[in-house]
Amino acid sequence: MKLKGSLACLLLFLLLGSGEASPLQSGEENTREEVGEAIGHGVGEALGDVLGEAAIHGIEKAIGQGTGKTEGLGIREARDPHLGDALAHKLKEASHALKNTGSEADRQAENIIGHGVDPAHKSWQGTPGSNGAWGTNGQPPSGGHGIPGSQGSSGGPGDTQDQVFSGGSGGSFGANAQGGSWGQGGHRGAFNLGANSQGTSPQPGSVRSNNNRNTECTTPPGSGGSSGNSGGSSSSGSSTNGGGSSGGSNGGSNGSTSSNSGSSNGGGSSNSGGSNGGGSNGGGSSNGGGSNAGSSGSSGSSSDTRNSDHGGSSQGYNPSPSSGSRVGSGVRNKPECDNPHVSGGSGGQGQGSSGEGEAVSGINTLNSQTSSESFNFDTFWKNFKSKLGFINWDALNKGQAPPPSTRALLYFRRLWEDFKHNTPFLNWKVITEGEDLPSLQKRAGGAGQPGTGWQDAVAGTAKNYNYNQQGPPAALGGQYPAKTPAKGGVTVSSSASRTYPGLLQWVKFW
């Protein structure tokens, strides 16, 4: 029970120690070391006392079981000084070992507390300030500057990320706004909530250099900013990020505390987009290795060292008239502010305007050709008739049907003969020539026999093509009558021949 109580006290002490270290919002390392040392000593002493008591209790119990005398025997009340000194020495060594273990636990606890304070520091430092820009003037509230010892590490992404929102001018939510040292404190200037602090977002005019919502169409270049608003990239070689120069770089911050502390671009460019990674612009190389491409709204704005002596005309080639000349102008452009003529940006409009001129000239050429060669129906109709020369257009125009040509007659005659050949079940001779009755009588088998008075009617039907006459039917139904007629001279015939007396003569029988 005593061991459990000691462990409970130890846990309570650890909780109190961690709670004591949690309010370290200012990040004072000395306080953190003191708290860690106190925790280490507390852990060592507590473990030493607990284990020492447990060892003494175990020894007393073991000796008591061995001798059978547990009443008057105890290490604390031992009369033998040598035994007491030996046990005390061993317990002291064990206590020192436990204290060393506690020191190690102190270091671990210190690291844990430090890592625990970092996120708390981040969240505390990111709370909105009075100006709605993550603290007053971009600084953390209550004057916090991050945990000491984490400053000065240029671009270390792993150890000093607690300074994401405290270093650099015009940052963009931890994107290392200007490529400067992450752990470097400094005044923030106007804070742009876009992806780039240079006003060089690919969306024209959406991100501005100084977060100015006024309706003016011009922006002063600032100290040393000879490049003006040339696409947000200052290849002039004279603007060292001074006061929002070079197309609104640094978002209006002062040059001394801008995000490129320690690098200052070597008198170089504006670090458009803040992607220079800790001042990699060395030696005035106008974003040399700073990966200005992509963050600037125009192509050709990265590594424009060739234009470094031309007054910042880094926009010599700007394929998009809307990107580069408007971006970084420092205002939200109005319709009358489109394509402002700024220093170094005048050449940026040449290519787009010339391309537009070419397109317009091509359209004008097409329109001129269309207007000169308007649609003429007479010409079209004449060309159409010339392509259909096999048609007698003169006869069609006069409304006269010309006699069919010999070739057409031969063609249709051949089609007719083929059709008759493919339909042998029809008696085409009777249909086309009108065959006499004797052949029909022979085919029916009733020629020269008595009782053939009805055949006259059949003959009249065949000659006159009158199929509706009522009379004795012809014996042509496929069932030939007997050679000898029945009594009374009546010839037997089929039901079909009786129903349709004159129709069956068109059918050929074999």
Swiss-Prot record:
Signal: is it a keyword of this entry? yes
| Localization in the cell | Secreted
Indicate the secretion signal residues: 1-21
Output the InterPro entries linked to this UniProt entry. Answer: Dermokine
Broad class of where this protein is predominantly found: secreted
The biased composition feature labelled Gly residues covers: 141-158, 222-231, 240-254, 264-292, 344-355
PTM text: O-glycosylated.
Question: Where is this chain compositionally biased, Low complexity type?
Answer: 293-303, 319-332
Q: Annotated region Disordered: where?
A: 117-362
Q: Which GO terms describe its biological process?
A: cornified envelope assembly
Q: Which cellular component terms (GO) are annotated to the entry?
A: extracellular space
Compositionally biased tracts (Polar residues): 124-137, 194-221
Which keywords does the record carry? Glycoprotein, Secreted, Signal
Q: What is this protein for, i.e. what is its function?
A: May act as a soluble regulator of keratinocyte differentiation.
Q: Which family does it belong to?
A: Belongs to the dermokine family.
PANTHER family with a match to the protein in the record: DERMOKINE
- Subunit notes for this chain? Homooligomer. Seems to be able to homodimerize and homotrimerize.
What is the name listed in the Swiss-Prot or TrEMBL entry for this protein? Dermokine
Which species does the entry assign this protein to?
Answer: Bos taurus
